[in-house]
Amino acid sequence: MCIRDRRAGVKALVAPDCPLGLLGAFHEGKQALLMCGNNLPDDPAVVWVVLAHESAHVMQLCNGGNLMPAALLSREVELARQQDPNPFHELQLYHSSQHHVEAEARLIQALPEEQVVALFEKHCAKRLSP
């Protein structure tokens, strides 16, 4: 995924000094995806979830906004919450203006790798350079 992020014009960085609890972030203005090396466990599954989540924000940038309409997002979040409510508890920590993009990212982080890559290529195809 990091290679695709770079091809889309986004820098992928690993920080050794993130605030406690922060696993990753995407800074739209700097077009940088940050992975927090000091907080991520040595577990490829966890690293993948964080990378998929932050790559969802890259997809939103490529798409020029939300990836799905609000009604569809509501239905998908409700279905996902029935399977695992945990990823959605943190939404209340965000300003309400961020709920849609963060909910989309949480849905994407739960998808299999192949689907995440396919979505990335779909939404960022115009930005991907050979």
Regions flagged by a language model, labelled:
Residues 7-20, 69-130:
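Metalloprotease/metallohydrolase-associated module, dominated by Zn2+-dependent proteases
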Residues 48, 52, 56, 106-110:
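Non-transmembrane alpha-helical segments in soluble domains
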Residues 55-72:
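Catalytic Zn2+-binding segment of zinc metalloproteases
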Residues 1-5:
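Conserved small/polar residues in nucleotide/adenosyl-binding loops
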Residues 41-50, 95-103:
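Soluble non-cytosolic domains of exported or imported proteins
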Residues 11-48, 61-62:
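Active-site scaffold of zinc-dependent metalloenzymes
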